[in-house]
Amino acid sequence: DTARSRGLGDVYKRQDGDYAGQKSGQIVGWMSIKPIIMHVIVMDDSNIKSVTDLKGKRVGMGQPGGTSMLDADFLMRTAGLEPGKDFKDFRVKLPAMVDMLGNGQLDALIWNGSPPMPPVIKLKSQHKVRILDIPRDLSAKIRKASPAYTEGDLPANTYADQPNEVMSFRLGNVLLIKSSVPEDIVYQATKAVMENLDFMGTVHPAWKKVSKDGIINGFTIPLHPGALRYYREAGVPGIEAFAKSVGQ
């Protein structure tokens, strides 16, 4: 009964694609976690210097159904490269892409995730690779086309042998929940997560940057009443202004 999404407005209003014609408000917000950042990775000795250099190359795009694959498609199409036409696209999971890049089956891999990502750490420990800059003009086009994306760079030294900041863009990483889930269940679940963030950080690194201060960042749709109740009790900064802005 939970989900992740890129286009919050589309999910909430049910107005586009698979959501068209469905009743609005069935999916609502729960909590915001660490934003995910786009990575475009090539071998260090490759002559690929930019996204546009991927024309005619073999590119790992992520597995079907994953949000990272959607983001990779969006990036490449915005750069003017059509999957299957301008380059050969491979739809596989990140660990498989890491192996394929390392053994020469891919020229590049694209993944949108919360850094530092363990498969990328593994890749850099075994091979010399580079993370490509995504130029400001390209990221600006992406952000203009979809407000779900925001400007965000990969900080220097996120990975070994990465002394410089890498220009990129990011996507708010939010958890959604069905509005039909009982309020008290969501309240208790929210309370359990928020009061055990140290433990959650041992489960996945994305939780290490989660805090009360940023728990509603990136939301433009109503929150589940159970989550809203807890955030009010916990004194989440800006919660009343946010609730008013979405009519809660």
What kind of feature is each model-predicted range?
Residues 35-103, 213, 217, 221-226:
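Bilobed "Venus flytrap"/periplasmic-binding protein-like clamshell domains
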Residues 1-8, 12:
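Single conserved hydrophobic/aromatic residue that forms the stacking wall/gate
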Residues 19-24, 217:
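Short, solvent-exposed loop/beta-turn-alpha elements that line the ligand-binding surface or hinge
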Residues 33-37, 169-170:
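Short, solvent-exposed loop/turn segments at the edges of secondary structure
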Residues 96, 113-131, 141-144, 184-248:
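An extracytoplasmic/periplasmic, membrane-proximal ligand-sensing/linker region
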Residues 13, 26-32:
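Short beta-strand-centered segments that line the small-molecule binding cleft or hinge
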Residues 64-74, 148-210, 216-219:
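Ligand-binding clefts/hinges and TM-proximal coupling segments of bilobed small-molecule sensing domains
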